[in-house]
Amino acid sequence: MNKKHLHLIFCVSILIGAYGCTKKAEEKPTDEIEKIISEMTLEEKVGQMTNLTLATIANEVDSTVVIDTAKLTDVIIKHHVGSIQNVLTHAYTLDEWHSIIEPIQKLTLEKTRHKIPFLYCIDAVHGTNYVYGSTLFPHNIGLAATRNRELVKECGAITAIQTRAAGIRYNFAPVLDVGRNQQWSRLGETFGEDTYLVSEMGVAAIRGFEGGDVSSPLHVAACMKHFIGYSAPLNGKDRASANIPEIVLREHYLPSFRAAVNEGTHTLMVNSAEINGTPVHASKYLLTDVLRTELGFKGVVITDWYDIVKLQERHQVSETHKDAVLLAVNAGIDMCIVPFDFKFTEDLIALVKEGKISEERINESVRRILQLKKDLGLFEHPYLEQEAVNAFSKPAYTATALQAARESITLLKNKNGLLPLTDKSRVLVTGPYADALSELHGAWSYSWQGNIEKLYPDSLHTLAEVFKKETPSTSIFDLSAWTKSNAWNKGALIQATRSADIIVICAGEAAYAETPGNIPDLAFDSSQVSIIKELAKTGKPIVLVLLEGRPRIIREIEPYCSAILLAYWPGSQGAQAIYDVLYGKYNPSGKLPFTYPRYSGTLITYDHKLLDEAIEIVEPYSYTYEFNPQYPFGHGLSYTTFEYSPIKLSADTLVANDSLKISVKVTNTGKLAGQEVIELYTRDMFASITPCVKRLRGFEKINLMSGESKNIDFMISKNDLAFVNQELKTVTEKGTFEIIISNQKVVFYYK
């Protein structure tokens, strides 16, 4: 990170940190809240637990949102609804958002008995993606590749400012699911496959969103989601069933949520799917025993979209919708994204009147919801906050987005040092996504799917446009040969290569979100495979730029490419960042946050068990072992080289409650300045259950000038060596361990 960008982050941090006093979700409600609850009718209480979508009160006329006053009155006055969320079809300007939210709040405060302020909610998952003029960052999978906690926090902080400026104080983010199935269509929304990495990056994002004080006009309430096990569908499809033994659930999927609870995160969203045959929305064990009692979560639990209805219609664990409401509320949900009608409201009221749910149980949820509104400052300052509006647009935000995109880009291959390119090279820029904005942004970008090109602002640039701006005299373009359906004109494309020295092809997968992104396997698009093979016949070196939210199989085309850049979904500054890396204006430093598979049938994470590598040979029951992904977790090349000194330990034995200091010196032995990520892994050589081959325990990112060295220290304790045993207890067992840094290993003992 250069000094200029450090200065920009510092300036933004001063603005954000002005409200930096630590203020977590309140554990005890105030007398004010108790007084309100004591005066509320049952109907008013259940209304606070009801969350509807914007479509229930508004229509779109000539691309303009128009509030239906009669519907709004019905929702707010008759049914006492306390929160609304979402957009109709696409993003809105700040003024449009204000024209939506302010009338709702005005009616709520002027016409309801208790004047409980109204709360608006949104998915701002990689920036404030439903507000025009906002800054869109790389998706979480790209942010995880940066291995830069402070940068992730800064992206979250800017998102909070721009979301609050719209009048929205509740953000359905971040995703804390651990992405251990690379086929899953929401992998790009996760921070990767490792629970430590997800925990570290997730907490950084939460600190950015909430800032220690969500009453500040520059912060929002975060929502850790989707509790729990959502990212492990058995068939790789969104919202599909998962079979997760509890020992695995606790080892790999629970820690990120535990970390977020410890951080004081205000809300949580529930997994839409089911685990071991039980829908999580109906699991009292997970939502109450584990989440509330074990983890100590005090905040609001909200359903995902339509998920109580799905208990009846999809999971088929209740005969009626009313029974589904009974299951979910008794399991522990506080607020239901219904989202279209009042069936939840009506059935819940009936269940209380029938004595099947106690009113005290309703009071618990209402208490948490009102406390959330109080924490957000809604009781004191319910209307638009000018301070947030004034802070909406700053050059520093764009600089942060550019830096995040640059640091996320992962150089997977660079044969014979083809990259960086020089200004003298004549470069053909082509591929189905070279002149597209959708694939730079991916899901949740101005629309749910992010795939409506006309919705993207004119101020944003495609990769082809950046090439035209930066190197007009040496760039050659063949874009008309491609269509969005990946059809291509072979003759025209091959003709264009004749005057080129190097071919840059921008490929991967089209934008998608959630279930529409379901695929049968991770195969690369066959049309794109064909054209890469044809281009390779020209003898010109190929640079493949991958835009994708998950790792599509490139085994067949990798040999034809001299260099491969994985850009993930890099956001609004993605094209400029890709160009900067290609031409050496920025030295790539991204590290894979997942294992890049070689085959669709071999989706193994880096922290697998040794037996996962077993390959049967001729003799029965005799095995060799091999783990050969396309690229391993943590892989990422640089234009410079780094040398590691031998690992030094403060002792060869870690005793009881002591800590062990691990030191290594890293030297930039190349000619260029660069950033390096130092990752520390441990390996348990013997345990009461089969240990993982290694586990990530720490990482640090440093910047080194050519010839510069830095000493890096890690501290580990027995907790860093712990695992969940057969009794579901987290334990650290005595024995031999390895420390692994880069290609070095050193043994130590714990006793």
Residue ranges of each PLM-predicted region?
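Bacterial Sec-dependent N-terminal signal peptides
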Residues: 1-28
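Glycoside hydrolase catalytic-domain context in secreted enzymes
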Residues: 18-725, 731-747, 751
